[in-house]
Structures are given as structure tokens and as C-alpha cells.
Amino acid sequence: MQHIVSLSGGTASAVAADRVLTRYGPENTTLWFADTSWEDEDLYRFLEDLEAYWKVTIVRYKDGRTPLEVAEQASIIPNNNIAPCSFKLKVEPFRKFIEQLPKPITVHLGMDFTEQHRMISPKAKYEEIEGITVDFPLMWEPVAMPPHRKVTESWGVETPKLYKLGFPHNNCGGRCVKQGIKEWQRLKHTHPQRFEEVANWEQAQREKGGPRANFSIMKDRARGDAKALPLHELGERKGEQLRLGTSNEDVIGCFCEY
């Protein structure tokens, strides 16, 4: 049986991959990574360090479009509820990749015990494909406990830069459209050019009129009813201090969402 691990570029999926490689061997394991064309440059260093540690080659896929290009082609402003980038740049090509492989296959995803609510959908979707089962190596005994960076650091692999800056993920150079207000504040503080590029794109989409005029990447839920909160209007909210530093990892669902 062949084992396929989808790597997100984060530490949790790296620990999951290591467990699969240890249990089944590199000769029976394929590691797959989808590049969104928006990644932080240090993510590539992290992947290269993992390849050197495991002595394997990671299969890399790149559509060529950025998440914002995917969203613009779909005539939407992406947010936590609607993010076609995840499906178009990661899920769909991964499905095509595993569909053409000889079966049986076990697909391994890097979700841990804190994310059990996220396991149901990808397990059901991938197991629709004949000959495929889904497993979650971080749930094997002993159950992997976050922060997973402690494990990758024990291999001599440096933690990705975004975690060190306090981001809870290593997605899209800190620009994940599913992230919350604090992460956008953090991006504005640590990578102002990246923040402005997204904020300017969002404003341009809203100015096109139609349904997009009333949507935004972020929502203001301060008064209980969610309303659009354009990034250009985002400031550090009164009484809320932005804290930089390390963070728990991989708390934003991206790859496995449908």
C-alpha cells in the first residue's frame, strides 16, 4: 500500500509526515505540497530542511495563481466562509494527484486532537474515491501534543519565521483570508507591504460595485451582528494590545476545507 502525506508547510503536518515515514518507510511514502504562489520565503527553507532531515524529495505542485487571483476570477471577496483558493489551489489538484495513482492508498492529514471537528469532511470526501482511506497520524499513540514546533526543533530544523512572529499558521505568507483580526493586525505590523497589497485589492473589488461592494475579507462582530470591516479600516481596537512572539501552530483550517 502507498501512503500519501499532504504537507501544508506547517509544523503539524511535518510531524504527521515524520510519523508516516517512520512507520511505513520512505519507499512506501510520498510527500506532497501545494504552493499557493503567496508563501513566505522561509517556508521553502523549512521544506528544504525537512527534505535534508528525512533524505526524501517532496513532490511540489504550483497552479501559478495567487489566492486573490482565484477570488477575482470567481468575482468574490474571500473570507472565512467563502475561500475558493483552498479548493482550487490545494484540494482539487491533490484529489487529481491521488486519483491517478495505483490503489490502494492511505491519505494522511496533519490534524491533531484539537481539530477533530475538521476531520469529518476531508475523510468523507477523499474516501469517496475507490481504494482510498484517510488517516490522521497525529492521533496515533502517543497522541501528538502541540506545540509541534518542539518536535521539529528537536530534529535540528528551525521553526518557520511566521510562527516566531506570532502567527498561528504558516499559510500564504501571513495573508490567509480565513484568519482573524489579530492576524491581520499582526501582518500590518510585521509585513506592511503585504498588508497594503491585500487591502488595496479588496478596496478595488468593492469599488466594482454589485454584491462585492458590501463584502470584505474581515467582519466586525464587536456588537454581535457581523458587518463588513474593510482592511483599510482595520486598526488595533481599543483596549486590545497586539502581542508578538511564538504561537500555537496550525489552528486555521485551509487545506482540508470543502
Which residues are covered by each model-predicted region?
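Nucleotide-activated chemistry modules centered on ATP-dependent adenylation/adenylyltransferase
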Residues: M1-Y258
